A protein has these predicted regions:
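Generic hydrophobic, amphipathic alpha-helix propensity
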Residues: 11-20, 36, 61-65, 69, ...
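N-terminal intrinsically disordered/low-complexity leader segments
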Residues: 1-10
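Short secondary-structure transition hinges
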Residues: 95, 99-134, 173-176
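Amphipathic alpha-helical linker/stalk segments
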Residues: 63-88, 117-126, 135-137, 141
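Amphipathic alpha-helical packing segments from all-alpha helical-bundle domains
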Residues: 116-142, 151-155, 180-184, 188, ...
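Helix-turn-helix
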Residues: 14, 18, 22-56, 60
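Amphipathic C-terminal alpha-helical segment
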Residues: 96, 134, 138, 158-176, ...
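Hydrophobic alpha-helical connector segments
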Residues: 74-103, 153-157
Length: 197
């Protein structure tokens, strides 16, 4: 009879969630394996058993952040309107950031000094940009957007979305400004700037 698994996927997810919280709220100095284990009510042995050490934990954290983000983007079914699909991707981008703010900083900043993800993890992270590029390609292909390099259009759209979400999560919005109404309009305005006239 095999021994029961004591360090399961649920514990792994709790450790990754807490590691992301520590990094995003207290910085890299707060993330020790001992503290992480204590915060999740487990042992450092469990952390080593699941991840092998801090470098692998950080890589797994980066991978998990992009996996969740990518899963949310991939869950959007395509419609026959690629521009509307782009708007919807932008809305999911914000929803994902608000659902997992502890991962947003891990994904899009240098919160972990001297961290370089593994080549496989980095490639998986880059794949999350593909739904936007693909929808831009559809919009260019059907004549809704001007003929321009797809990655340039996608970068401009991402910049709007990323900038507003970063301002919101970092608490840098002007007092009293409600982001939700401005957010979708900003994405639409950027998309309209690429429309074929």
């Amino acid at each position: 009879m095999p021994r029961p698994k004591t360090h399961d996927d649920a514990l792994r997810v709790r450790l990754l969630d807490r590691a992301g919280e520590l990094l995003s709220t207290e910085g890299p100095g707060a993330l020790s394996l001992r503290r992480l284990a204590a915060d999740v009510n487990t042992s450092t042995t469990a952390v080593y058993s699941l991840f092998g050490g801090k470098p692998a934990l950080l890589d797994a954290l980066y991978e998990e952040a992009f996996r969740r983000f990518g899963d949310r983007l991939a869950a959007l079914p395509a419609t026959d309107d690629p521009v509307e699909d782009i708007i919807r991707l932008g809305l999911v981008y914000r929803a994902s950031a608000l659902a997992d703010p502890q991962f947003y900083l891990v994904m899009f900043s240098k919160v972990i000094p001297n961290f370089t993800p593994s080549a496989e993890t980095d490639a998986a992270a880059a794949d999350t940009f593909l739904p936007l590029v693909e929808n831009v390609g559809r919009a260019v292909g059907c004549g809704m957007f001007v003929a321009a390099p797809h990655d340039q259009i996608a970068l401009a759209l991402w910049g709007v979305v990323h900038g507003l979400v970063s301002l919101e999560l970092n608490g840098n919005l002007p007092p009293g400004v409600e982001i939700a109404p401005a957010y979708e309009r900003a994405i639409r305005a950027c998309a309209d700037g690429w429309r074929r006239r």
